């Protein structure tokens, strides 16, 4: 990957980690191990080891089911508050190429901030709104949707990073609009 595409890939993978910590890491590990789409430099090439792939697979299964069980999903989100930004930092640094080679701390911080921001939006705005409006019934479908989005974004971030950038801009714009609309409605209700 060249510098431009590796930057988009890094941002895409770290954003994806904000939704599910293990999907982007497992995607990177599997694609690095079995294809030429991504080449990991040391120390990130450890992700290609079988024991790491196996561990990520087990953690993904645990996260998948924990996020679908009421009450357990809240505990999972608390734990993931630390795990997802860390996974985002690793995904960013592993895929950022030149940036990670010259400024590893900078790439780790960027990944941490991107994944942390996505996770914060998910756990502080989206999930509470879904829980409040559906009485918790919508949490499982939203969780499945988050896993699907994380998987698609992880693959797009590596295969077609420019397309990911366009999708990320659209999703970010929609999310800002949604927050603004929600705040406006809340303000209008408070005036009544």
Model-derived features with residue positions:
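The feature identifies polytopic integral membrane transport proteins across all domains of life
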Residues: 109, 129-142
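Helix-coil boundary and interhelical linker segments in multi-pass alpha-helical membrane proteins
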Residues: 1-5, 32-50, 92-107, 157-164
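C-terminal ends of transmembrane helices
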Residues: 61-74, 123-130
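Hydrophobic, membrane-inserted alpha-helices
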Residues: 5-11, 88-91, 146-156
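Mid-bilayer segments of alpha-helical transmembrane spans in multi-pass integral membrane proteins
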Residues: 86-95, 104-128, 148
């Amino acid at each position: 990957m060249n510098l431009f595409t590796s930057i988009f890939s890094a941002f895409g993978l770290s954003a994806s980690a904000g939704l599910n910590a293990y999907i982007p890491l497992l995607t990177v590990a599997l694609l690095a191990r079995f294809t030429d789409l991504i080449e990991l430099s040391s120390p990130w090439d450890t992700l290609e080891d079988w024991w790491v792939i196996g561990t990520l697979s087990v953690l993904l299964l645990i996260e998948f089911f924990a996020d679908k069980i009421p009450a357990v999903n809240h505990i999972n989100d608390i734990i993931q508050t630390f795990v997802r930004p860390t996974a985002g930092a690793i995904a960013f640094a592993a895929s950022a190429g030149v940036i990670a080679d010259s400024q590893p701390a900078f790439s780790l911080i960027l990944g941490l901030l991107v994944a942390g921001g996505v996770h914060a939006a998910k756990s502080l705005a989206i999930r509470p709104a879904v829980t409040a409006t559906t009485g918790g019934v919508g949490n499982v479908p939203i969780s499945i949707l988050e896993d699907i989005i994380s998987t698609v974004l992880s693959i797009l971030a590596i295969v077609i990073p420019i397309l990911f950038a366009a999708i990320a801009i659209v999703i970010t714009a929609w999310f800002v609009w949604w927050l603004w609309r929600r705040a406006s409605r809340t303000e209008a209700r408070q005036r009544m």
